[in-house]
Every structure is written in C-alpha cells, then in structure tokens.
Amino acid sequence: RVEKRKPFDFSDLKSIIFGSAGMVLILIFVVHFCQTGLQGITGLYVVDKFGFSTKQVGVIWMALAGILIVVQGFLTGPLAKKIGEKRLILIGMFCKALVAFAMVLTTGFVSVLVVFGLFAVSSAITVPTLNATLSKTDNQHKGTLMGFASTAGNLSKVIAPLLTGYLYESNIELPYITTGGIALIGVVICYIWIKNQKNK
C-alpha cells in the first residue's frame, strides 16, 4: 500500500521557515556561501600575495580534494554518531570562520596548505551532515525542503563570487574578513538552533 502524502499547503510555509528546518536552510546558505567565496578567491589571492606558481596552486587543490575524500568517506559518519550531528555542524561552522580569518595571517605555501587543509575538513563534515539533518527534519514535506535547500545553496553560489570579487578589488584580504564574519553569524545561528532543540 502506497501512503499518500499530504499536498503542500502554503500555510505550512511559515512553520517551515521559522521552525527547525528554517534554521537548517539558513545554515546551508551560509555554508555554501563560505565555501564558494573561499574557493573562488583563493587562487587569485595566493598568486597576488605570494606569487605562487600554477603548480603550487594545483597542489593546494589536490590536497583539498584528497582530504575531502578521506574525511567525508571515513570520518564524518562516525563523528556524527559519536558527538551528534548538530555539534558536528557547529564545529564545522567554527572551523570555516577560523579558516577565513587565518588566511589573512598566512605567510607562505606551508601555512596556506595547513589552513586549506582545515577548510577541507570543515567542508567534509558540514555539508553531508547538514543534508542528513535536513532529511530528518520534516518527513511530510521532505521534497519541498530539499527543493528549498537546493535553492539556498544555488543562491549562495551566485551571491558569494559577486560579493567576494567586488571586495577583492578594494582589498585582497577583505573577502576573507567578510566571509569569516558571515561564518561567525552561522556559528551563532547554529548555537541558537541547538539550544532551541534542547529546550523542546
């Protein structure tokens, strides 16, 4: 027997946006914004600031991909079970803020590699965990929520390059400071979300 789903009612939109699912959607926007902003500007940043060669930039992206594969494939699931999905998201958001501010303090190839390694870890633990959390939030409107999540992610991928590119023209370090501030807002939102869930 196939269970019929309740058709989406726009009166439910308010409860979704202002409920737990709404918090997750905001976090998805913030996470994708930070990732797109950092990834899009770093190639230019390391060339302009340090004069990195194409080979050095390639090594950074290769290391990023390798760490992402290892952490997401082998560590994210066990960590989520051990400390909880919400706490793992909070840690990942904090790491994103740390990465953004730390990039301003980098002094060369090794420090950039270390900072971007942390960026890879934060990406590997936040994105899949957020998606998993969203899928458990509201079974009745799961398809609608996934659509909202996709929209939030895509919107951030449009806004982030435009904003960071504009800021980069004024000061090459300003995109990192701005992204770090946005990531800290994400940390606060995540903390409030966790506290609200505990109080229920």
What are these regions (language model features)?
Residues 141-169:
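A late C-terminal transmembrane helix in Major Facilitator Superfamily
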Residues 134-142:
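Paired intracellular helix-loop junctions of major facilitator superfamily
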Residues 1-27:
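Juxtamembrane intracellular "pre-TM" segments in multi-pass secondary transporters
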Residues 85-130:
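C-terminal transmembrane helical hairpin of 12-TM major facilitator-type secondary transporters
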Residues 40-57:
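Short amphipathic helix-loop junctions that connect adjacent transmembrane helices
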Residues 71-85, 168:
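Helix-to-loop junctions at the C-terminal end of transmembrane segments
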Residues 164-183:
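A membrane-interface helix-boundary motif in multi-pass transporters
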Residues 18-37, 117:
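Pair of pore-lining "gating" transmembrane helices in MFS-fold secondary transporters
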